Curated annotation (Swiss-Prot):
InterPro entries: Kinase-like_dom_sf, Prot_kinase_dom, Ser/Thr_kinase_AS. It is a multi-pass membrane protein. This is Putative serine/threonine-protein kinase. Keywords: ATP-binding, Cell membrane, Kinase, Membrane, Nucleotide-binding, Serine/threonine-protein kinase, Transferase, Transmembrane, Transmembrane helix. Its EC number is 2.7.11.1. It comes from Mycoplasma genitalium (strain ATCC 33530 / DSM 19775 / NCTC 10195 / G37) (Mycoplasmoides genitalium). SMART domains: S_TKc (SM00220). One of its GO terms (cellular component) is plasma membrane.
């Protein structure tokens, strides 16, 4: 894909490629491009839209024509989605792309290109790496904007589920006063494709990022034809991801010990089904119960906690609006089953009691033995000093 567009290429006589920025969802590539179509723009617009991001996606051979057509239709839909906290899409070109490279004109087929707003600030991931975590007031301010953007997508006439919410897809403006969500178009389309896709055993077929994926992504259902298919996603897919992001913004890490082993992705994703969310107050004493409860309700996918799980982003926004009100903890610390506690318990059960006595006895013997050696050396030094 990197060879398809090169620095200096002029795309559709509108955009000139300046550099490759990054990889995106669905094996797409993001390029920074100069906007050559600014004749009718005023000074402010020229400054704002002088550079755009071009997202380029080439048709995957595994996607059939019907699903590819749906994908193209959804890309056009993204240009109609307008919210202050969503990256704007201005232009969609498909399925042919015309490139001028030097004296050559190249025509590419089975490609879709989306021209999007360029946000020149850092991502949430970059800020987390730099700051560690945010203050409570900062979190409420930014997180509310993120949730409002997702609520808008969920309220759209063809409900759009993002499905890949993570700090890398949350961008800040250069002055850090606002945020923009990225990749909502790509993710929503995959939802439609996934509903008709058979459940695959290949771990890489899972769409999203493991640390932010709700365990429901592993569940399947049987369609009218008796075929096993993936369970259609719903609003709680994004709500769960929001809870993980809220936790990470306040604490600086994801809640579960999710060391990503490519061979154990399913086991990692299931952890939220088996363990409770750790209390953030164990790390920071200034976190109010209200935010503890919001994070808990977003991620309450453990069977016994389902009664607290948010059913919509509107419920979440109501709680965010009242975050300063005093409230009791929904599930106190002594009632939560935490990942680390269970691992220690399981480790102890794997070893017989005699093994622990033997280990402790050996440790005590070693300490006493070393102490005697040190004492002997000290006495010897004292003796030599006197005589």
């Amino acid at each position: 894909m990197e060879a398809i567009l090169k620095i200096g290429d002029i795309v559709e006589n509108k955009y000139q490629i300046e550099k490759l920025l990054n990889r995106g969802g669905m094996d797409s590539y993001l390029f920074l491009a100069k906007n050559l179509n600014l004749k009718n723009y005023g000074p402010v617009q020229k400054k704002q839209y002088g550079h755009l991001v071009l997202k380029v996606v080439q048709k995957n051979p595994k996607i059939n024509e019907n699903n590819w057509k749906k994908f193209l239709d959804e890309m056009v839909t993204t240009t109609r989605v307008h919210h202050s906290n969503l990256v704007k899409s201005f232009d969609v070109v498909n399925p042919f792309l015309k490139i001028v490279r030097g004296n050559k004109t190249i025509a590419l087929n089975q490609i879709v290109m989306i021209a999007m707003e360029y946000v020149d600030g850092p991502s949430l991931r970059q800020l987390l790496n730099r700051k560690g975590y945010f203050s409570v007031s900062e979190v409420v301010y930014y997180f509310t904007k993120i949730v409002k953007a997702i609520d808008y997508l969920h309220s759209f006439k063809h409900q759009i589920i993002h499905r890949d919410l993570k700090p890398e897809n949350i961008l800040f403006t250069s002055d850090l006063t606002d945020i923009k969500l990225l990749d909502f178009g790509i993710a929503s389309t995959v939802v439609k494709v996934a509903e008709k896709t058979e459940v695959l055993t290949d771990e890489n077929s899972l769409f999203g990022t493991v640390s932010y994926m709700i365990p429901d992504v592993l569940e399947s259902t049987v369609n009218k034809a008796g075929k096993k298919v993936r369970k259609p996603p719903n609003a709680q897919y994004d709500i769960y991801s929001l809870g993980i992001i809220l936790f990470e913004m306040l604490v600086g890490r994801v809640p579960f010990n999710k060391s990503i082993n490519p061979n154990k992705e399913r086991e990692t994703i299931q952890k939220a089904r088996n363990f409770d969310l750790p209390l953030m107050q164990a790390t920071r004493s200034d976190i109010p119960n209200s935010l503890e409860n919001i994070a808990f309700r977003c991620t309450a996918v453990k069977r016994e906690n389902n009664k607290w799980l948010y059913s919509s982003t509107k419920e979440l926004l109501e709680d965010l609006a009242n975050w300063e009100n005093e409230q009791a903890m929904i599930k106190p610390a002594n009632e939560r089953v935490l990942e680390g506690q269970v691992e220690i318990r399981e480790m102890m059960l794997e070893k017989p009691l005699a093994w622990y006595f033997k280990t402790w006895a050996l440790s005590i013997f070693t300490i006493v033995f070393i102490g005697l050696i040190i004492a002997a050396i000290v006495l010897l030094l004292i003796f030599n000093a006197r005589f």
